Amino acid sequence: MIGFSARMQSTRFVKQLKYLGRLGYLAQALIFSLMTVGVVNAEESHFARFERGLATFDPGGKYITQALERQVPGLNVSGTLSHWSDFLLSGEENIGFRDRDFDVLQMQTLLEVALSYRFSTNLELTSISHFLYDSAYDMGGNDGLYADKIDDSFRYYRDFERVARELYLSYRTSAVDLVVGKQQVAWGKMDGQFIDVINAMDFRESVQLEASDYETRRLPMWMANGTYYFKDVSLNVLWIPDFVANVNPGYGTPWSSPLLPPDDTTVRHSDLWLKGRVNVAGDKILQTDKPHWQNISDHQMAVRLDAAAGALTWGLVYYYAWERDAAPFVVGRFSDISGDHLVLEPRYERLHHFGATADYAWVATGVPGVGNLPIVFRAEALYTRDAQFVDYRNLGEVRAGGEGDGVSEHDTLRAALAFEFAFPDKISVIFQPSFYYTDDWHEGLGTGFGGAIGDRWNFAPVFFISRPVHGTRDRLKTSLTLTPYFSGPNRGYQGSKTKLMVSYEFSPFINGSFIYTDYSGGNDDDLFGQYHQWDNVGFELKYEF
């Protein structure tokens, strides 16, 4: 009876999430349709009335936030209803190992509810809950989308770990901040996660993921987070008993790499493949042993020191952490009717991260054609000791009877500089050259934490420019991001990613965006080159209350 009740509750919960997904999608379509009709067909007076009505459209604030805060003194309530839809521009076809019979990359609706209760001036309890549903997995005939069979969180959130996103108690004074509970910590400011490494990440969007997504895609952990403020120096210490691994775009996800064997037909009908117990060589893969909070030796620890001297701020970081992705170590051999095979044990190994960051702001005067030009310079770097890489060269030797475990350790470095310019007419320009390096790299080496992809080094000079349209009172904004990817000594150019975004502030509560993303250049086995048929357009709508 209890099991039947639980199934009924689960069924109702899924139906509610489906309804939430459809609601977000319809709301998005309605708002964009109304805006289009208003701009193109309606008289100015009609559009003005529509805008005035939309400016005060805040049912969540009126009927939820304000009502609850009146009933419970000391309670603060806020929320966000967001919807993202991304559609492929190329036709349905098999690409590499992928059965790409779908044309929707995501159709996600996310409801975020944030509650905070202030016990006193210094003491506050905060809860942030996430309710997500991705309708892309409901599309009929999509044999290529089956990741929800492996992990249902790709489709919707229903367990405590995902729904209870953050839950912490904070005590703050002018000299001390102490936050205990489940939380995310953002140490970096740049696109590329250079020192932003405290939390694992949900990488379901693969190369489409950008800095604007980090707040939503980080995976919070249970920890104690304390900061002490001196006059011009602050010391931040993290004690983290918890461990969370990365979520990667594996089999059956829209962004599963076309280079990842075997084909989808093999995987989606095999429990061994769905559970990750076998590979294309027929090897046996054991259960992954994760760090556990009950073992003090498994806990993680991080320290950050920041200092300020006028317009210059700088910081040093150290993080004694675990790998976010397990490396498959060879631990045995066996034979069957198909031949000799290996026994692999995925393990998370310890890492030592050493990082540095700096910011400097100034105004360049007398710039020709510009006048005064505000500039911000940023730098971030992370050096990682003993990152684990799958070593396919050694793995081949082991298969031939040689020694080794198929994994090798390499130090890695990733660093970036950013130059931010605030030109007249509110034009913002950012140039961010980014660099990734794997020490002692050789042919046949896979990927590892912080290292280059497919080569010894990678170089990605990111260029960003944005400008508002003044005729819309700066409510309409356009931006362009260009990310070419170079590497050496072998691959050279690995392709480029181009992102064009047009956003509009419908009201103080509602924002919408249209996004075009293009992947071009490089070879079919390169970082961006493999996704050259994943060009897409996206629509985003966000309502905050």
Predicted regions and their residues:
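Repeated loop/turn-to-beta-strand initiation elements of outer-membrane beta-barrel proteins
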Residues: 75, 123-125, 175-178, 232-235, ...
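Residues on the lipid-exposed face of transmembrane beta-strands in outer-membrane beta-barrel proteins
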Residues: 111-117, 127, 166-171, 224-228, ...
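Outer membrane beta-barrel
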Residues: 122-265, 310, 516-517, 521
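Residues that define the transmembrane beta-barrel architecture of outer-membrane proteins
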Residues: 73, 87, 103-111, 160-165, ...
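Transmembrane beta-strands of outer-membrane beta-barrel pores
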Residues: 83-89, 131-135, 173, 184-186, ...
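Detector for outer-membrane/organellar transmembrane beta-barrel domains
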Residues: 104-106, 321, 359-486
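Outer-membrane beta-barrel "beta-signal"
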Residues: 206, 531-545
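N-terminal periplasmic/intermembrane-space "pro-region" immediately following the signal or transit peptide
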Residues: 2-4, 8, 17, 34-128, ...
